[in-house]
Amino acid sequence: MVQVVLGEDEGIESALRRFKRQVSKAGILADVKRRRHFETPLEKKKRKRIATRRKRRFR
C-alpha cells in the first residue's frame, strides 16, 4: 500500500505529485487495468512472452 506523509511545510500539490509518482512506480494502475477483464491462460502466456521479448531487446 502506498502512503504519503505530509510534512509541516509541504503543500497538497507536492504531496499529490509524490503520491502519483509512488503509485506509478509501484505499478498499481497497470495492475488494475490488467485485472479489469478476465484474462485467459493463453492471453497470460502471450502477454508474458511479449514482456520477455521487450526485456531482451533493451538489454
UniProtKB/Swiss-Prot annotation:
GO terms for biological process: translation. PANTHER family: MITOCHONDRIAL 28S RIBOSOMAL PROTEIN S21, SMALL RIBOSOMAL SUBUNIT PROTEIN BS21M. Gene3D superfamilies: Ribosomal protein S8 (1.20.5.1150). This is Small ribosomal subunit protein bS21. The lineage of its organism: Bacteria, Bacillati, Cyanobacteriota, Cyanophyceae, Acaryochloridales. Keywords: Ribonucleoprotein, Ribosomal protein. Belongs to the bacterial ribosomal protein bS21 family. It comes from the Bacteria. GO terms for molecular function: structural constituent of ribosome. One of its GO terms (cellular component) is ribosome. InterPro entries: Ribosomal_bS21, Ribosomal_bS21_CS, Ribosomal_bS21_sf.
